């Protein structure tokens, strides 16, 4: 027999409430945009960005926030809109404001104050500071325009705001054909994995420039990294991001610093020698004013180290093994052909390929407490994007599956690692669900295995886009363009 469930809401009431929330979310969009463009204020909801988002995306961010609430209550636009409106009237200076956390703090510490008074007091540090920001925009040059280079371009263009942060000024490539500029623009505009570019792109072949969402980008053709005078394009004190992977040590990357207009260099691959390998959220505070060249480590190192740090801080790691199930990359072959690496010459779309990974060793460079405790290996699989790290760990302190999952959920919600660690608890998610994830890694709670002191954790990661977001965070720190974050 069919079970009859009681009806608690009428259809018209349900739709009416949706339309009401939809209208409020729609009213939030111009306020979010004005604060971003005019005040350099970045808004989010528990780490989910609101800039350039649709009405539905804003409503989904509110719905997602229930995972961040102690009582699993859904965050309402009726709660966030008044805070956003109050912010828009305060002539704020540059800031990063989490509306979800502002609501939670108002509920806990409002003490009978009006929302306007609470917001003014909470943001007092930047109230009335519009146009008073002493920061200058930092010019950025992308040396290379492959998978990571194009995703970095998308993120930088998206984050342009009022122009006081990172500004993409040029890309450097080797000329591949007569219609090279058109083809480069097409690859930025369309992507088989990440979808279409969110905006407009125009091409000026006479001057070798692309204009993407108002960003004038000079395309420079060169085969020699040390031979370019960037100042002739109006570029000065620039941060250059080498995403070719061709040079990985200070000597090779130092060629860029010989060029007029370049001040600092970031490598999007594991660095060799004495180069600092930086994973944002873990050791980004190690970046010093005198550091001219740093590495943003690898996608896998970025994915595993935040989770490893969280686990080690709470339970202590005795030892362990890291196995990565990694999507194929353009270093592999479509069909069997010669490759200098073992097994990697075999067809990537047709095979699972066992190969090596330096992530375990690199993790110890970023987090020295793990030195000598981890081994690692990798399996390349026939998917174009999104990988998984399996962390098989022996702990000093025994735990349970429920306890460690809840701990990692809290780390994803309320810790300093919330931009690096995400958390999902669903028996239905698969790899493509994580395309476009902006986190370094996503813990899959349903897959966690625990037996006293032994735990196996599974972390998904978008090895392209998630890693690129981490690179941009490192760039922002190196350039000193990170605004203060609220609530405190």
Predicted regions and their residues:
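C-terminal substrate-binding/catalytic lobe of Rossmann-fold NAD(P)-dependent dehydrogenases
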Residues: 2-61, 314-316, 320-443, 447-453
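N-terminal Rossmann-like NAD(P) cofactor-binding subdomain of oxidoreductases
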Residues: 2-333, 341, 473-474, 481-485
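Short beta-strand-to-loop capping motifs
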Residues: 173, 393-397, 459-461
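Short pre-catalytic strand/loop immediately N-terminal to key active-site residues, enriched for Gly-Thr
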Residues: 291-295, 454-459
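A generic structural signal for alpha-helix starts
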Residues: 302, 398-399, 465-466
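Glycine-rich phosphate/pyrophosphate-binding beta-alpha loops
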Residues: 380-384, 460-467
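Generic C-terminus detector
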Residues: 455-461, 470-488
């Amino acid at each position: 027999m069919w079970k009859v469930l009681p009806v608690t809401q009428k259809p018209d009431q349900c739709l009416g409430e949706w339309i009401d929330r939809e209208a409020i979310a729609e009213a939030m969009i111009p306020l979010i945009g004005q604060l971003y463009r005019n005040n350099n204020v970045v808004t989010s909801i528990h780490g989910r960005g609101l800039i350039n988002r649709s009405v539905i995306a804003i409503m989904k961010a509110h719905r997602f926030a229930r995972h961040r609430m102690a009582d699993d209550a859904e965050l309402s636009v009726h709660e966030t809109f008044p805070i956003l409106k109050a912010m828009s009237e305060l002539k704020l200076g540059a800031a990063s404001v989490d509306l979800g956390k502002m609501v939670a703090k108002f509920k806990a510490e409002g003490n009978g104050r009006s929302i306007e008074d609470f917001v003014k007091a909470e943001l007092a540090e930047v109230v009335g500071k519009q146009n008073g920001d002493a920061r200058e925009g930092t010019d950025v040059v992308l040396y290379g325009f492959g998978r990571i280079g194009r995703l970095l371009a998308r993120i930088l263009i998206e984050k342009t705001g009022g122009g006081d942060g990172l500004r993409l000024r040029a890309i450097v490539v080797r000329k591949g054909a007569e219609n090279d500029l058109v083809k480069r623009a097409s690859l930025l505009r369309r992507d088989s994995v990440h979808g279409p570019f969110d905006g407009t792109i125009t091409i000026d072949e006479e001057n070798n420039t692309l204009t993407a969402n108002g960003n004038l980008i000079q395309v420079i053709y060169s085969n020699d990294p040390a031979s370019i005078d960037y100042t002739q394009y109006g570029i000065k004190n620039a941060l250059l991001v080498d995403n070719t992977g061709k040079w990985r040590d200070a000597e090779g990357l130092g060629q860029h610093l010989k060029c007029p207009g370049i001040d600092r260099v970031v490598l999007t691959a594991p660095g060799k020698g004495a180069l600092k390998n930086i994973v944002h959220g873990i050791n980004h505070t190690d970046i010093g004013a005198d550091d001219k060249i740093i590495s943003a480590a690898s996608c896998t190192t970025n994915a595993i180290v935040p989770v490893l740090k969280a686990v080690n801080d709470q339970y202590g790691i005795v030892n362990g093994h890291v196995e990565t199930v990694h999507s194929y990359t353009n270093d592999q072959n479509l069909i069997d052909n010669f490759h200098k690496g073992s097994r990697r010459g075999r067809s990537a779309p047709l095979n699972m390929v066992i190969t090596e990974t330096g992530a375990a060793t690199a993790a110890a460079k970023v987090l020295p407490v793990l030195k000598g405790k981890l081994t690692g290996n990798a399996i390349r699989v026939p998917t174009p994007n999104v990988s998984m790290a399996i962390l098989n760990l022996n702990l000093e302190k025994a735990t349970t599956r429920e306890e460690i999952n809840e701990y990692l959920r809290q780390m994803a919600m309320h810790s300093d690692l919330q931009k690096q660690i995400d958390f999902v608890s669903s028996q239905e998610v698969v790899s493509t669900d994580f395309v476009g994830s902006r986190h370094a890694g996503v813990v899959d709670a349903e897959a966690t295995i625990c037996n006293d002191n032994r735990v196996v954790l599974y972390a998904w990661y978008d090895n392209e886009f998630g890693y690129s977001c981490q690179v941009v965070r490192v760039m922002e720190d190196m350039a000193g363009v990170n605004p203060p974050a609220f609530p405190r």
